[in-house]
Design a protein with these regions (language model features):
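Compact mixed alphabeta submodule
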Residues: 158-221, 445-479, 483
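Internal glycine-rich, Lys/Arg-flanked active-site/core loops of soluble domains
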Residues: 81, 89-134
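Active-site nucleophile-adjacent alpha helix/oxyanion-hole segment immediately C-terminal to the catalytic cysteine
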Residues: 63, 67-71, 263-372
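Extracellular structured ligand-interaction cores
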Residues: 109, 135-137, 175-179, 413, ...
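Conserved short secondary-structure elements within globular domains
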Residues: 115-188
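Papain-like cysteine protease catalytic cores
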Residues: 347, 351-438
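N-terminal leader/targeting and assembly helices and adjacent pre-domain segments
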Residues: 1-100, 185-269
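Active-site or metal-binding loop neighborhoods of secreted/extracellular toxin and effector enzymes
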Residues: 397-493
Length: 493
C-alpha cells in the first residue's frame, strides 16, 4: 500500500495541494473505523444507535483526509533537490520514510488506541443521555492504566449531573490514551475539584464525541494547522464519497456503502477512470460486459445443428476461432465486469489468454476477485457444503432450485460458479430483485429478453447443473463485496 501511495505522490499527475492520495486515505480511514468499531463493541450501551455510530465513521473519513493531506504535502516538499530538479524516486522514498514511519506507524498507533477509547466513551455517553431520568449523575472512574498520569487524579470520584458545565471542560478521554472512564449513578453530586489551565484538554481532544460524533476535534493540528488547499481538497473528496453512498441501493448497510465507496476510489485510481452513475441492468447486461464475444453458432430455423430444446443453428460466418475464442472462455471476468458496471464503471472483460490472471481465475479461483467489506477474503457458499448441511448426496434440478432460493434469498447480485453435466463449468450471475424475482443474467453472451436466448433461465441452470461438484463451485453475493485490486488487469476500459 505504502509504495503505491508514494508512487502516486511522486507522479506528475498528482497535485498534493488539491487532491487526497487515495491509497493512504483508504488505509487510514479503515484503521480508524476499525478502532471505532472496537470501541463500540467494548461499550456497555444497550441501544446501538446506528445512525450516530455511522456519523462517527463518516467523520473519521474527514479526520483521515486531513491527516493524509498533511502527510502528502510534507512528503511533496522533499521532491526537488536544491537546484529544483526532481529527485530519483528511490532517493526521495528513502528521505520521506521517516515521515511515513511516524504518520502511519507510531502516531497512527496512538490515534488508533485513542479512537478505541473515545468511541467507547461516545457510545456510553449516548446511553447516559437515554437513562438520565433514572440515573441523572455521572461519576469519574479512576484510570485502569498500570501507570496512570497525575493530571486526572484530582477528578477521580467526582460526581456531577450529566448536563453540568463541568463535563464540557473536563472529561475522561481528553488526554491521548487516557484510560479513565465514566459511570452513571443516582448518588448525590460532589463539589467540583479545583483545576488549573494545565488541566485543559490536549489538542484535538477538546470535544465530547458523544455529542458531536467526532473522535477528534476540529481543533486537531491536522485541521487547525492544515496546509494550503486542505479544506477544499477534503470537502471535494467527502462530496464524492457522499455522492457515491447516496446512489447505492438500500439493500446495503451503511458500513458496506462506505467500504464500497473506498473501493470505488481505489478502482478509479488504478484504472485512471472516473466512475459514472450506476448502470441499469439493461446497460450493464445485453453482452455489454463482453462486447467482443462472437457466437460460433447462430440461431437459424434452417440450420443443421440442433440443441436439446429443438432450437436450430448454423455456423456463424463472422466467427474467427483464433480471434474470438478468448472471449468465449472468459466467464470469470464477465461476471465481475457486470457487477462493476452496475456500480457505474464502464469496464469490459478481457479475453482469457495463457498465463493471464484470468487463466488463473478459471482454474477454480473465480471467487478470489471479491473481498468482504473489512478487506478479508470472501467465502462462497459451496454446493458441497450445502449438500452436507442438508444431508443430500448429490444435486438434482429440484435441489438446485432449492439451493438457489436459499443462498440467493436477499435482494442482490450473486456470482455463480457451476459445473455442467457434460463436464467443464461456468461463472455467471444470478440476481434477486426487489419484487422477489430471481433472474439468470448471462454477462458473457446475451440471454436477455429479445435476444433469442432468453430460454436460458434459472430453470435451465438447474437442469444443466452437474450432480456432483468441486468445492470451488457455489454462490457468493457480490454487490456488497469489494473488488480485489490484485485482479484489476482483467478488465478493459
Amino acid at each position: 500500500m505504502l509504495r503505491r501511495a508514494l508512487l502516486n505522490i511522486y507522479s506528475k499527475e498528482f497535485h498534493p495541494a488539491s487532491e487526497i492520495e487515495v491509497c493512504l486515505f483508504n488505509e487510514i480511514w479503515a484503521q480508524i473505523n476499525n478502532a471505532a468499531k472496537e470501541g463500540f463493541r467494548q461499550s456497555r450501551a444497550a441501544d446501538p444507535d446506528e445512525d450516530f455510530r455511522n456519523e462517527i465513521l463518516r467523520n473519521n473519513a474527514v479526520f483521515s483526509a486531513f491527516k493524509v493531506h498533511r502527510m502528502q504535502n510534507d512528503m511533496a516538499r522533499l521532491l526537488l533537490d536544491s537546484k529544483g530538479n526532481l529527485k530519483p524516486f528511490e532517493q526521495w522514498k528513502n528521505e520521506v520514510m521517516p515521515i511515513a514511519s511516524h504518520q502511519v506507524g507510531t502516531w497512527l498507533r496512538t490515534e488508533y488506541d485513542t479512537a478505541v477509547i473515545r468511541a467507547h466513551q461516545a457510545a456510553d455517553w449516548r446511553q447516559f443521555e437515554r437513562e438520565k431520568d433514572i440515573l441523572p449523575n455521572l461519576r469519574w472512574v479512576e484510570s485502569t492504566s498500570i501507570h496512570p498520569g497525575l493530571d486526572h487524579k484530582r477528578f477521580w470520584g467526582t460526581i456531577r449531573p450529566i448536563d453540568d458545565a463541568f463535563w464540557s471542560e473536563h472529561r475522561p478521554g481528553d488526554r491521548w490514551n487516557c484510560k479513565c472512564s465514566l459511570s452513571s449513578t443516582d448518588e448525590p453530586e460532589t463539589p467540583v475539584p479545583e483545576s488549573s489551565p494545565l488541566d485543559k484538554p490536549q489538542k484535538g481532544l477538546e470535544n465530547n464525541p458523544g455529542k458531536d460524533a467526532k473522535l477528534f476535534s476540529d481543533q486537531h493540528p491536522y485541521q487547525s494547522g492544515a496546509r494550503e488547499g486542505a479544506k477544499k481538497a477534503v470537502d471535494k473528496l467527502m462530496a464524492r464519497i457522499d455522492e457515491m453512498i447516496d446512489e447505492m441501493s438500500n439493500n446495503l448497510t451503511y458500513e458496506e456503502k462506505m467500504a464500497i465507496a473506498r473501493n470505488n476510489l481505489e478502482i478509479e485510481n488504478s484504472l485512471k477512470v472516473t466512475k459514472g452513475r450506476p448502470m441499469s441492468v439493461e446497460e450493464a447486461d445485453k453482452q455489454n460486459a463482453n462486447p467482443r464475444h462472437v457466437n460460433e453458432l447462430v440461431l437459424d430455423p434452417a440450420g443443421i445443428y440442433r440443441d436439446g430444446r429443438g432450437n436450430r443453428y448454423s455456423r456463424n460466418k463472422n466467427y474467427d476461432r483464433t480471434r474470438d475464442m478468448p472471449y468465449s472462455i472468459n466467464c470469470q471476468t464477465c461476471a465481475p465486469a457486470y457487477a462493476l458496471r452496475l456500480r457505474g464503471f464502464d469496464v469490459t472483460a478481457k479475453g482469457n489468454t495463457p498465463g493471464s490472471k484470468l487463466e488463473y481465475l478459471s482454474r477454480g479461483h473465480a471467487f478470489e476477485v471479491w473481498m468482504n467489506a473489512d478487506g478479508t477474503p470472501a467465502r462462497h457458499v459451496s454446493i458441497n457444503s450445502w449438500l452436507d448441511a442438508k444431508g443430500y448426496q448429490r444435486m438434482t434440478p429440484k435441489r438446485y432450485m432449492e439451493y438457489f432460493n436459499e443462498v440467493c434469498k436477499e435482494e442482490g447480485v450473486y456470482e455463480l460458479c457451476i459445473g455442467w453435466k457434460g463436464g467443464s463449468g461456468h461463472a455467471t450471475i444470478l440476481q434477486r430483485f426487489a419484487d422477489g424475482e430471481l433472474r439468470y443474467i448471462e454477462p458473457q453472451s446475451d440471454n436477455s429478453e429479445g435476444s433469442g436466448m432468453e430460454w436460458k433461465d434459472v430453470k435451465y441452470l438447474c437442469e444443466k447443473g452437474a450432480s456432483t461438484s468441486h468445492n470451488c463451485r457455489g454462490v457468493m453475493r457480490v454487490d456488497n463485496k469489494l473488488f480485489n485490486l490484485k485482479f484489476i488487469e482483467i478488465f478493459d476500459v
